[in-house]
Amino acid sequence: MTSYAVNPQSIKVHVEAALGDLLISSVLRLDELTVVVDGAHYLQAAKILRDDPNCRFEQLMDLCGVDYSTYKDQPQTGLRYCVVSHLLSVSLNQRVRLKVFAPDDNLPVVQSLCDVWSSANWFEREAFDLFGIVFEGHADLRRILTDYGFVGHPFRKDFPVSGHVEMRYDAELKRVVYQPVTIEPREITPRIIREDNYGGLH
């Protein structure tokens, strides 16, 4: 059985008290606390989680985007894009997951956390690049994983697996060129081996 330096239920009580009315929901599942705040109060909530003496989440460990358009194979019922941050308190040995949903699915915008935790910089650039989530107040919001000529955001669930364009080296032009994707769309079905014990491999 896992023993915790701080009881997860105590973390929930402290975080709920610190955030107060800024909190939309707070769920403790598998001894991990997830809190959801409104986009209008995202930056304020982050500062409270960093500065409150019972929270003291000094470090942002990770930040990513999520596309909920087909979550659990169900049609979308709420907002589509979410930003999820994982925060760590080194001094109190506790963690929390902070979630905020972008209020507009057509142009997802949330506030940048770079002024609260500088480690958010490249994480936010990655979420912008892969999901198209715009971080308001980010000083250098540009692509970080795809090239600067890339069209679209490849982690969105409506982005085609094959992409839109491909690159190849053109010997005549002596440079890399873009061209429309040349592979045909296809449905990929996993191979199933029906022999007993996988053909005697086990």
Swiss-Prot record:
It is a peripheral membrane protein. NCBIfam families: NuoC_fam, PRK06074.1-1. This is NADH-quinone oxidoreductase subunit C. It is an enzyme of class 7 (translocase). PANTHER family: NADH DEHYDROGENASE [UBIQUINONE] IRON-SULFUR PROTEIN 3, MITOCHONDRIAL, NADH DEHYDROGENASE UBIQUINONE IRON-SULFUR PROTEIN 3. Its EC number is 7.1.1.-. NDH-1 is composed of 14 different subunits. Subunits NuoB, C, D, E, F, and G constitute the peripheral sector of the complex. Pfam families: Complex1_30kDa. Belongs to the complex I 30 kDa subunit family. It comes from Albidiferax ferrireducens (strain ATCC BAA-621 / DSM 15236 / T118). GO terms for cellular component: plasma membrane. The keyword Cell membrane applies. Keywords: Cell inner membrane, Cell membrane, Membrane, NAD, Quinone, Translocase, Transport, Ubiquinone. GO terms for molecular function: NADH dehydrogenase (ubiquinone) activity; NADH:ubiquinone reductase (non-electrogenic) activity; quinone binding. NDH-1 shuttles electrons from NADH, via FMN and iron-sulfur (Fe-S) centers, to quinones in the respiratory chain. The immediate electron acceptor for the enzyme in this species is believed to be ubiquinone. Couples the redox reaction to proton translocation (for every two electrons transferred, four hydrogen ions are translocated across the cytoplasmic membrane), and thus conserves the redox energy in a proton gradient. Its main location: membrane. The keyword NAD applies. It catalyses: a quinone + NADH + 5 H(+)(in) = a quinol + NAD(+) + 4 H(+)(out). HAMAP family: NDH1_NuoC. InterPro entries: NADH_DH_suC, NADH_quin_OxRdtase_su_C/D-like, NADH_UbQ_OxRdtase_30kDa_su, NADH_UbQ_OxRdtase_CS.
